[in-house]
Amino acid sequence: MNPSAAVVLCLVLLSLSGTQGIPLARTVRCTCIDFHEQPLRPRAIGKLEIIPASLSCPHVEIIATMKKNNEKRCLNPESEAIKSLLKAVSQRRSKRAP
């Protein structure tokens, strides 16, 4: 076999093996697709989840579970109303902690 052909063949094989594990398309898997825009009363919220940005979802997600019907609502983390709600919840928790 020609030495230059052997080198080309080796380079082709090496390049093919290097791309084997690279995903072709990255899927985004966020829990929240749409945001609840109406204001919420803090007392109506049973549980508040804050999911930080990750590789699977590039933005912060805030999910409120309502006390009355266990409905989950996605909240807009950029909204001023939600920022003040998070601040109020944080202050309430700090008062409870000994």
From Swiss-Prot:
Keywords: Chemotaxis, Citrullination, Cytokine, Disulfide bond, Inflammatory response, Secreted, Signal. Pfam families: IL8. Residues 1-21 form the signal peptide. Disulfide bonds join C30-C57, C32-C74. GO terms for molecular function: chemoattractant activity; chemokine activity; CXCR chemokine receptor binding; CXCR3 chemokine receptor binding; cytokine activity; heparin binding. The modification Citrulline is found at R26. Gene3D superfamilies: 2.40.50.40. GO terms for cellular component: external side of plasma membrane; extracellular region; extracellular space. GO terms for biological process: adenylate cyclase-activating G protein-coupled receptor signaling pathway; antiviral innate immune response; cellular response to heat; cellular response to interleukin-17; cellular response to lipopolysaccharide; cellular response to virus; chemokine-mediated signaling pathway; chemotaxis. In the central nervous system, CXCL10 is predominantly localized to activated neurons. Expressed in both microglia and astrocytes. CDD domains: Chemokine_CXC. It is found in: Secreted. Monomer, dimer, and tetramer. Interacts with CXCR3 (via N-terminus). Belongs to the intercrine alpha (chemokine CxC) family. Pro-inflammatory cytokine that is involved in a wide variety of processes such as chemotaxis, differentiation, and activation of peripheral immune cells, regulation of cell growth, apoptosis and modulation of angiostatic effects. Plays thereby an important role during viral infections by stimulating the activation and migration of immune cells to the infected sites. This is C-X-C motif chemokine 10. The lineage of its organism: Eukaryota, Metazoa, Chordata, Craniata, Vertebrata. The gene is Cxcl10.
